[in-house]
Design a protein with these regions (language model features):
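Extracellular/periplasmic catalytic domains that process cell-envelope and extracellular macromolecules
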Residues: 27-28, 60-63, 95-99
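Short active-site neighborhood of thiol/selenol oxidoreductases, capturing the structured segment around
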Residues: 29-43, 68
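Bacterial Sec-dependent N-terminal signal peptides
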Residues: 1-17
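A short beta-strand-turn-helix
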Residues: 16-33, 62
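Flexible coil segments in periplasmic/lumen-exposed cytochrome c-class electron-transfer proteins
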Residues: 147-155
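Detector for the c-type heme attachment site
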Residues: 46-50
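Thiol-based oxidoreductase modules, predominantly thioredoxin-like and allied folds used
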Residues: 55-86
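Non-catalytic, surface beta->alpha helical segment in thiol-disulfide oxidoreductase systems
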Residues: 51, 93-147
Length: 155
C-alpha cells in the first residue's frame, strides 16, 4: 500500500485512499496532519520509522493531536488535494520535497503550515529527525508555536 494512514493506538492500521481519508478525519476532529514523505529505498526513512515513529511518547502525541499519513514520493497512486488530482510523486513535488524523509504539517483544513527556521521561511522539515527532536517538533506544531516562534530556537 503506497499511501497509508496510521492510527496509532497500539497497532498500526492501514487504509487505501488514506490521504483523502486523513484530510477528512483531520477536518472533522480539528487535528493537524503530519505527512511523512518517504521512498522504499530510503534507509533514513526506515530508521525514522524504527526510532521516532515507534517511540511510545511520539505515538501518544500523534494519536492525541494529529492525523498521520505516509506518502511514497515515488508512488503512482492518484490522490486528490485541494480539488486537483496528483500522483503521489507529483504531490511530493507540489509540497517541495526533494530529500527523504521529509515531514510536512497541514492545518486541519488541509493548508500547508509555513514556519520559520533561522528566520528562513519553510514549508517542510527535510531529513531524518532524532526522536527527542521529533517530540519537540510535534509539540511545537501542536501548540501553534510556529505562528510566533522560529523553529531553530526549539530544535
Amino acid at each position: 500500500i503506497a499511501v497509508i494512514i496510521v492510527i496509532l493506538s497500539g497497532n498500526l492500521a492501514f487504509s487505501q485512499n488514506a490521504f483523502e481519508d486523513a484530510l477528512k478525519k483531520a477536518a472533522s476532529e480539528n487535528k493537524r496532519v503530519v505527512i511523512d514523505v518517504y521512498t522504499d529505498w530510503c534507509g533514513w526513512c526506515k530508521k525514522m520509522d524504527a526510532e521516532a515513529y515507534s517511540n511510545d511518547e511520539v505515538k501518544k502525541l500523534l494519536e492525541d493531536n494529529f492525523v498521520l499519513v505516509k506518502l511514497n514520493a515515488e508512488g503512482k497512486d492518484k490522490l486528490t488535494y485541494n480539488g486537483k488530482k496528483y500522483t503521489e510523486e507529483e504531490l511530493s513535488y507540489y509540497f517541495e520535497v526533494f530529500s527523504f524523509p521529509t515531514t510536512i504539517f497541514l492545518e486541519s483544513d488541509g493548508k500547508v503550515i509555513s514556519f520559520k527556521y533561522d528566520n528562513y521561511p519553510m514549508k517542510n522539515i527535510p531529513g531524518y529527525v532524532k526522536t527527542d527532536e521529533f517530540k519537540k517538533l510535534l509539540i511545537f506544531f501542536r501548540d501553534g508555536k510556529y505562528k510566533d516562534i522560529d523553529l531553530s530556537t526549539v530544535i
